[in-house]
Amino acid sequence: MLSSNVPARKLPELAGSRPNGVVVDPNNLTPFLRMEGPRMRIVDGQFSPTPRRDFLKVSGASLSAAAVSGLAQAAQTTTEQKLPSIQVGPHRISRLVVGWNPIGGHSHTTWTMAQFMRQYFTLDRVVEFLRKCESEGITAWQFDHTDIGVGAIQRLRELGTNMKFICLHAERAIDAPIKKVIDDTGCIAIVHHGGVTDALFRAGQHQKVHDFVKKVHDHGVLAGVSAHNPDNIKRIADEGWEVDLFMCCFYYVTRPREEQLEKLGKVAVYEPYYESDPDEMTAVMRQVSQPCLGFKILAAGRLAWTQKQVELCFRRAFERIKPTDGVIVGMFPVYFDEVAADAAYTRQYGQIA
């Protein structure tokens, strides 16, 4: 049963203070909940917006007492525990990989949230955030080759880290050459960007993706392909490309307008997220032999209104994928310790028998 009077738990913060909210009576939330709905919560007696992206991830009114207790216990023990891990080439990485999108300001929701993410994640905060991830047992980061991505990796190495780095890249005209990516970051793998993959396959230019994979291998690192369309992952596997890993989006968000009209008779506003998408992608993930990293398991925050939702998404993700697969999850821990919570869910549901 969900508790209606659980006080907000004080959680560790990254550098910088959370924005001040309006001081309210935690026992009289009715006018505020009526005004703002479930996107707000009380933190230390203050009224604050609570997004994962711009969506509610946790509220005192929606967490059960048992869940709060469990997360608190997990936070105390995580430094002594390791996360379940998988093999990617010669490297062992945690089944939970921290994602890039919040750091890069890719909110998949609103321009305002994108700006908030970019402004929040300064270089210092990114480094502190990644060190927090590593302390919770997360040993891999999927990043983009940008100034802040490169700077964070170089700073982490100066401070000392065992974290592995996986770069999402495409070597378009706007992108750095593959050699520079490797020289700058020492990444263990470079994965072809999923949005570009889907566009090239749709245009009949899938050979460009295959050539990218070969070129990455020529530079001596693992090569992967990301996609949102499960048919593209299946085709690559069926054709026997020399791919070391896949990144597989749980939602076919690049589904083109004409395909939506043909199959559904209607078109979603902005990105389409459909309930059946995870089943379709994970069915393909189970069929391919390579390790797969599933991403957008929370539908870019659309399934993160409560911790019960988040926990369910983690459980279902690990139930659907192979034991040799993992998940990539972006985190925005401004108001809630998402790192500790997500690590706890991975320990609970991602154990490999």
What are these regions (language model features)?
Residues 34-49, 54-75:
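N-terminal export signals
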Residues 60, 64, 71, 75-101, ...:
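N-terminal amphipathic alpha-helix/helix-capping segment at the start of soluble metabolic enzymes
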Residues 98, 223, 292:
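Conserved, mostly hydrophobic/aromatic
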Residues 184-188, 238-247, 289-290, 321-324:
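Glycine-enriched alpha-helix->loop->beta-strand junction motifs that scaffold or abut catalytic
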